[in-house]
Amino acid sequence: MNVLKHTTILLVMLLISGIMCAQEKKLRKADESFEAEEYYKAMEEYTAILKKIKDKNEKIEIQYKIGECYFMAGYYKKARSPFKRAAKSKGLMVKAKNRLAEIEIQEGNYETAIELFNEVLEVKKDDTVAREGLKSAQWAVEQYNLPTRWNIEKAKHLCSKANDFCPSIDEKDGFDHVYFSSTREEAKGKKLSGITGTKFSDLFVTKLDRHGKWEDVAALDSLNTQFDEGSPCIFDQGRKFYYTSCIAERGKNMGCQIYEAQKVDGEWMNPANLGIVSDSLSIGHPTVSPDGNRVYFSARLQGGFGGADIWYSEKNGSTWSAPKNMGSWINTEGDELFPFMRNDTTFFYSSTKHPTMGGLDIFVAYLNEDGHWESHNMGYPFNSNGNDFGIYYYQNEDKGYLTSDRKGSKGEDIYFFTKPPLEFKLKGMVHDLDTKAIIDSSLITLYGSDGSMFRDTIILANKKETFNFKLKTKTDYVFVVTKDGYFNGKSRFTTDSLEFNKTFEYDILLESLNKTIEIPNIEFAFGRWELTEPSKAILDSTVRIMIENPHIVIELSAHTDMIGSDQSNMELSQKRANSVTSYFESKGIPAARMVAKGYGESKPKVITKYDATYPFLPKGTTLNEDFIKSLSKEEQEVANQQNRRIEMRVLSNDYVPSLD
């Protein structure tokens, strides 16, 4: 009995040991798949293991790994649930919450992401991932609120239900050929990628026909294999074709290389490995310098800054040099991928490490005078909450394509971007200054610094109608509004240095010629008539009115208070009126256009609605001697000050300027 008992225990122990060994073996296999970046395959293997694990802590660790697989494969929504479970573990909370925050960013929920990053920092103040993630999320919110002229829309002629990415254009004067990568159903391979769980990507092309319509998308069967091809780069006016091709054995990714194909009788033929690195290494995403002597690409190679870097290789006859790193001007400890060289001084790429709006962002680098690259995040709308990469920019136009899995995408989609020309407009109304009534049939003349002139009589029959003019860029404008019986209206503005569309809106208020206008704040010393410097500065605005209305003849009148004799006040006011006209003459206004008249105290002021600022001086009050005597001493001084004034009145509007 004891022998049987011991034998049974031994068999159970051996069985448990065998099960544990089998599970450990499967776990190692799943870990190896993950290390090989076969994330979808690893996810399936971890999921199978999870069902057989009883230990709670081990289950949570596997849940976290499943979340990582989904995240790295781009299935962010599916990654949320396993990360939430892992976040309950003290040991995994920080990593899991950081991932959850990154998922919220991918979904465009920046405020939720900010909350999660802050929760991590409350527990671990020096966590680099949370600190940089928080900075990026806050920066992204700012970017969405900045104005932009760029229009971006999905390139429906290139997109399918699968992943479509990395376009390259053979620019042919309106008959563009667009080459791109896709995992669509028509892709050649029958097996599924261990990385994404989708079909392997192939190369495809479509082109504009002579009617301006896109032809059906076709696969490049001469270059496609059973495995991944992608990231095309057209060069030499459509005669050379660079692309990435990857091989796999027994379902395992064996790395990627850059190939070059030649166009023969209209077909891409003779694909050849450039041989930049050995087959044991992996490189991809080629772009070529304008002279064809450099190939830039992305790779994880020894001597880099961490993650994937941008490297280049130089052509030596029929071979290519060993890779050289582009340096810290471009590369970081994160991933730099998908380079595109537009010209010798403009270089695009995507990065995860510079402050981004989420995942990969597109950056542009300009070569400065010191030979160094200066990088800038292209901001919204080039970048978004998702991964943005694979940009192609037309050589001589502000338009192109990019790839994104932003909101509204079905996986990775290709988007078309354009920068429409700046639009500037002038619009507005013309009203009577006093009555605020619409002034109909005004003549508006618009003068541009480029020598242009537009003139139109504007009919404004009701409050909803406005005058409208289209304007040019980088131009200074003066517009003049004229109407019989009114002073001319004038204003200046410029479209120079403006980077965004703008409508200049003006409500032009014209002042009637049939009224006396007080020139405010013209002050004289007691009993004197010489103009003070502040008074001259005020009179300059009236000089401008005379210049802008060259046909008017005016009376410039001076008035005094009632202190002193009638005779002395009359003489003083005449001298003051003469001082004003003399000043106008010194500014170039002909004497024939002015009449100086001193009225002394004979025309006391009548308070208008504009002057009724004192409760003891209501509108309509005449400031004569009897009224002033009825006021207190302090109030009398105010009333006397109101009577001391310079006024302007239009006598005629038919003056003909001299031709001299």
Question: Which residues are covered by each model-predicted region?
Answer:
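Periplasmic OmpA-like peptidoglycan-binding domain that tethers envelope proteins to the cell wall
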Residues: 351, 356-358, 559-660
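Structural marker of alpha-solenoid helical repeat scaffolds
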Residues: 52-55, 89, 123
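Short, conserved micro-motifs composed of acidic
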Residues: 72, 99, 106-112, 116-429, ...
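Periplasmic peptidoglycan-binding/tethering modules of Gram-negative envelope proteins
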Residues: 422-553, 592, 614-616, 636-639, ...
